[in-house]
Amino acid sequence: MSEGVDLIDIYADEEFNQDSEFNNTDQIDLYDDVLTAASQPSDDRSSSTEPPPPVRQEPAPKPNNKTPAILYTYSGLRSRRAAVYVGSFSWWTTDQQLIQVIRSIGVYDVVELKFAENRANGQSKGYAEVVVASENSVHKLLELLPGKVLNGEKVDVRPATRQNLSQFEAQARKRECVRVPRGGIPPRAHSRDSSDSADGRATPSENLVPSSARVDKPPSVLPYFNRPPSALPLMGLPPPPIPPPPPLSSSFGVPPPPPGIHYQHLMPPPPRLPPHLAVPPPGAIPPALHLNPAFFPPPNATVGPPPDTYMKASTPYNHHGSRDSGPPPSTVSEAEFEEIMKRNRAISSSAISKAVSGASAGDYSDAIETLLTAIAVIKQSRVANDERCRVLISSLKDCLHGIEAKSYSVGASGSSSRKRHRSRERSPSRSRESSRRHRDLLHNEDRHDDYFQERNREHERHRDRERDRHH
């Protein structure tokens, strides 16, 4: 029992010590304080408004605390925004040219220059981003650079923002749409001009005279070829119909048929060629418009140009005949025609007989000279364009070619020809030169008249020498 009492006393002491160390009243007071502190704010809010001012004063430092963060982000944006977009210049502008223009306004701290390029071909889009080292340089660029002219175009300068970037990109697309059909020709890089040309198709031709004409002139001369470039090789197709000259030469004596023949052979080209004429609308196409006015004169477009065209492609004789083709039918009567033809036949037959006899005797130069003289006389007659006259001329030419071939084959080996040349004080080289001159003059119709006069004088001198030799 005593041990139990001791124990009880001990526990009682401990409990007492605990009570002494941790007083229940204090604990109760503490809890009461906490409870009262928790209950007081609600009473204060409902009763008085003094505590809120400190609460309102506490957010005040928060902006002060956030101010450095805002300034920091703004300074970062400023470092990014120390750049501008410079645009509306031509695609062939170089970085050196752009830097020179920037330096001309007093900005020397260009850090970087980025050109916007087309991914397809690497071509400049006409604008670039200019990065500078200071905000002051940005202000200078925005204020002073827009008035500058670069390669004939006024430069457009805007801050480096997404909105301005999209605007410059849209302008570049418009310029690209205008430039694509013209191939590699320098485009009109000014944004206003490009927008005008995109809105109205007539502006490229109207902008031929305005300012910056030296830059706009190459593109503005070619607006009509926006579609035909793919069809331009067709300009080489009209010559294929030219092979019909042979039928023309056969029916040249009758004036009415050639126009019909030309029109039939040249009917396919008309739907191809009018696009190249550009200015005149290909509405109702008369027979004259199937010809290219750059090569054929328009006044003679009804019947004249087709014969001239084909005569130029054919021999000079046909060309010469085409010039004389007009007058004979209207000025020569039936009786006069028959008389001239009778005289031409006599000239042809006598010239052939004399040439054959001279060639058989070895005097090839005289034979050639006789035939050339006869050909010249018949071709200068008023009925030279008639089919019968051309038959006479062709027979004379055949005889001439045969004698020339024979003279070349014989050469200088014939003793009789050598003696005749020596007696006439002519060397074989001179004889060959004379025959060569005959042949050249025969194929050169423009000098036909001079040749005829020269042949007459030479023929007279030759006859005088022959007469002196025989007497």
Curated annotation (Swiss-Prot):
The modification Phosphoserine is found at residues 205, 413, 423. One of its GO terms (cellular component) is nucleus. The modification Phosphothreonine is found at residue 203. SMART domains: RRM (SM00360). Residues 34-68, 176-220, 409-471 are annotated as: Disordered. The keyword Secreted does not apply. Residues 82-162 form the RRM domain. It is found in: Nucleus; Cytoplasm. There is a cross-link at residue 354 (Glycyl lysine isopeptide (Lys-Gly) (interchain with G-Cter in SUMO2)). Component of the cleavage factor Im (CFIm) complex that functions as an activator of the pre-mRNA 3'-end cleavage and polyadenylation processing required for the maturation of pre-mRNA into functional mRNAs. CFIm contributes to the recruitment of multiprotein complexes on specific sequences on the pre-mRNA 3'-end, so called cleavage and polyadenylation signals (pA signals). Most pre-mRNAs contain multiple pA signals, resulting in alternative cleavage and polyadenylation (APA) producing mRNAs with variable 3'-end formation. Component of the cleavage factor Im (CFIm) complex which is a heterotetramer composed of two subunits of NUDT21/CPSF5 and two subunits of CPSF6 or CPSF7 or a heterodimer of CPSF6 and CPSF7. The cleavage factor Im (CFIm) complex associates with the CPSF and CSTF complexes to promote the assembly of the core mRNA 3'-processing machinery. Interacts with NUDT21/CPSF5. Contains an Arg/Ser-rich domain composed of arginine-serine dipeptide repeats within the C-terminal region that is necessary and sufficient for activating mRNA 3'-processing. This is Cleavage and polyadenylation specificity factor subunit 7. It comes from Mus musculus. The gene is Cpsf7.
